Design a protein with these regions (language model features):
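Positively charged n-region of N-terminal signal peptides that target proteins for export
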Residues: 1-4
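Short, solvent-exposed, charged loop/turn and helix-capping segments
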Residues: 63-82
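Amphipathic, charged alpha-helical scaffolds that flank and support histidine-based chemistry
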Residues: 42-54, 87-112
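Bacterial N-terminal signal peptides
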Residues: 7-15
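Inter-heme linker and motif-flanking segments adjacent to c-type heme-binding CXXCH motifs
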Residues: 100, 122-128
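Immediate post-signal-peptide N-terminus of mature secreted/exported proteins
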Residues: 21-56
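The canonical Cys-X-X-Cys-His
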Residues: 112-123
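Short cysteine/histidine-rich metal-coordination sites, predominantly Zn2+-binding motifs
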Residues: 130-135
């Protein structure tokens, strides 16, 4: 009976570790997609390509919803709030682009960048060998 219980606990621990690794890999994918999307947005804002800005800002809203869920699982409340704020500012960017308000687009893009910087400062740690890890 004790061997069976021990084996069951080992299997459960392995399953939880696998789920956590999968979540972390998903998170890295979201961050890479966010970086690429923000890079596109910078060029689109400069070119005043409002339909593209609206589309890519909406993509950010969806990514930040996933990020919110990721941090909610670990009860990292400040990161959840940051992800919610990032969703809101990305939605504002999409709305500004849809309305054709160039000044609002430029100002709101600064808000998107600030959202990224705030969360990275609080929850991203640079590794000595290169790359980053989630704090």
């Amino acid at each position: 009976m004790k061997k069976r219980t021990a084996a069951m606990l080992i299997c459960l621990a392995g399953a939880f570790a696998t789920v956590a690794m999968a979540d972390d890999q998903e998170f890295v994918g979201w961050m890479k997609k966010t970086g690429g999307t923000v890079g596109k947005l910078r060029k689109e804002v400069e070119a005043k390509a409002n339909p593209d800005i609206a589309k890519d800002a909406t993509t950010l809203v969806e990514i930040f919803k996933d990020v919110e869920g990721y941090f909610a699982k670990s009860h990292t409340d400040d990161a959840v709030a940051m992800a919610q704020a990032a969703q809101a500012v990305a939605k504002q960017l999409a709305d500004a682009a849809s309305s054709g308000d160039a000044d609002a687009v430029a100002n709101t893009m600064k808000g998107v960048m600030a959202s990224c910087a705030g969360c990275h400062g609080a929850h991203r740690e640079k590794l000595p060998e290169g790359g980053y890890k989630i704090k």
